[in-house]
């Protein structure tokens, strides 16, 4: 299996490789090939409680110049790629791996690429490290199974801790987060290897040029705490200011006696009528949509206007009829359900329910308003004198009662002087041909 440690410098990549990979492998007697700065046999042997000779036999330190040619396969006589026997069941650790397998279009040498392809098949594992996985050649990156990302916690003032986020591969070069944890540095691990280059003396965490999150929040925290304290004081004072003072003398009986006659309850001209709380809203537990349907009962009487069964589904239409015999609203079952009502079709009609509110719609008889089928006839007085128009229908007396009081007239036909179309006579026309020179 190929494990990749990623993170900024001093985040804990090499620390994790030593503590969680190299030391456990040596303790189990496993061969380790490490390209890591400053590993010390004597200190590792003392830390593990092993003989220094055993550590020197198991731990092989690889120089930078030997990495590319050491970790490579060989071909047998048949041309088959074979991994050297010394790497079988071994652990390979390479720091700054991008220096040896840099990301470029040029493919790796077949011997090198086959080494990483065959290492896991021969019982070997590898831990490789760099600051950015995209600096690594794709032929090696595609074979990474686990990726661990290391993060410093100096931004929140935790110099002695670091954060590790764990990823697992889903496809070559792609990873999915599977967890993470915050760990504490073990000071006993640092002397076992060189975390800094030889001769470097400034090993403290650099803190200039910025602030951690707590320093940035200190001023805001002080302001919010002050405002919060003032707010809590006035909040508590609001509920405790009206409590009776135990040292305050009690009011006399004459001051607490209730008025017993008319007008005694008036003080400064204002009646001492107790304020009645508003009545509870019976529809308070309904939504706005449910309330709309419930309030239709104030506008009219509910009625089942039609009912049908289509296939295995019931269809029905509900109306609300007002006092003027007009339909103020009509909804079908699907609309009522959309408005939040439970609808059930029963033998006597339709039952609507929303919580504790229930309405029943039955098919009570109702006659829809019908407009008059007969045309109205208007009788007008011929001289327009003060009379009103008589209104009559085909089945009435033609407004005879009005005609008894208003003098009527007859509309007669009279010819016009110039004639009336089409009774006027047609125009007579004549044509003539003027005399020609031959006739003259």
Swiss-Prot record:
Coiled coil: none annotated. It comes from Xanthomonas phage phiLf. ATP binds at residues 7-14. It holds the Pfam family Zot. It comes from the Viruses. Isoform G1P plays an essential role in phage assembly. It is required to increase the number of adhesion zones between the inner and outer membranes of the host cell. The extrusion of neo-synthesized phages occurs at these adhesion sites. May be involved with G4P in creating zone through which the phage assembled and extruded. Residues 417-440 have a biased composition (Polar residues). Interacts with G4P; this interaction results in a complex that spans the inner an outer host membranes. A motif (DEAH box) lies at residues 95-98. Keywords: ATP-binding, Host membrane, Membrane, Nucleotide-binding, Transmembrane, Transmembrane helix, Viral extrusion, Viral release from host cell. This is Gene 1 protein. Residues 386-405, 413-440 are annotated as: Disordered. It is a single-pass membrane protein. GO terms for molecular function: ATP binding. The keyword Nucleotide-binding applies. One of its GO terms (cellular component) is membrane. The chain crosses the membrane at residues 213-235. One of its GO terms (biological process) is viral extrusion. Belongs to the inovirus G1P protein family. It is found in: Host membrane.
